[in-house]
Amino acid sequence: MKTTSLKPADVDKKWVVIDAEGLVVGRLASIVAMRLRGKHKAAYTPHVDCGDHVIVINADKVKFTGRKYDQKVYYHHTGYPGGIKERSAKFILEGRFPERVVEKAVERMLPRGPLFRQILGHLRVYKGSEHPHEAQQPQALDVGSLNRKNVSA
């Protein structure tokens, strides 16, 4: 049996839309990261960008399990001494850009490497139910039905 190694020209990229309403952030991000890398395909090749384009809608309606909504803290550093900043998940989700919670979760599940920025460029996250990618005819992926733990009660 011969091992298949995809060439960039042979990759068939699909468009997938995921409705994130009521889904658990970490479980959603794990599935999205797998789709972006292309690991759901039989002909996955690590050094080729063979993943799909993923659109996540209703990113402002994601859920956290336990008390993470109030207690989870996101850190970033300004680059200056003593410049560590922190924001809670609640602060971000109730702010102007709630989709950043999903973006950061997916970004941190992808491996840093030569393809990182290219793969991350195939992710589109929107806070409402509207998206401007109808022309690509994305297929709907029901993440909630894949596992009952994906949906928060």
From Swiss-Prot:
Q: Which organism is it from?
A: Methylorubrum populi (strain ATCC BAA-705 / NCIMB 13946 / BJ001) (Methylobacterium populi)
- GO BP annotations listed: negative regulation of translation; translation
Q: Briefly, what is this protein's role?
A: This protein is one of the early assembly proteins of the 50S ribosomal subunit, although it is not seen to bind rRNA by itself. It is important during the early stages of 50S assembly.
In terms of HAMAP family, this protein maps to: Ribosomal_uL13 (MF_01366)
The set of disulfide-linked cysteines is: none
Which residue ranges does the record annotate as region Disordered?
A: 129-153
Family statement? Belongs to the universal ribosomal protein uL13 family.
A single GO cellular-component term from the record reads: cytosolic large ribosomal subunit
Which Pfam family, any one of them, does this sequence belong to? Ribosomal_L13
Q: What is this protein called?
A: Large ribosomal subunit protein uL13
Q: Which UniProt keywords apply?
A: Ribonucleoprotein, Ribosomal protein
Share what the entry says about its subunit structure, partners included. Answer: Part of the 50S ribosomal subunit.
Tell me yes or no: is Ribosomal protein among this UniProt entry's keywords: yes
Q: What is the lineage of its organism?
A: Bacteria, Pseudomonadati, Pseudomonadota, Alphaproteobacteria, Hyphomicrobiales
Ribosomal protein recorded as keyword? yes
InterPro entries recorded for this chain? Answer: Ribosomal_uL13, Ribosomal_uL13_bac-type, Ribosomal_uL13_sf
UniProt-listed CDD domains: Ribosomal_L13 (cd00392)
Molecular-function GO terms, alphabetical? mRNA binding; structural constituent of ribosome
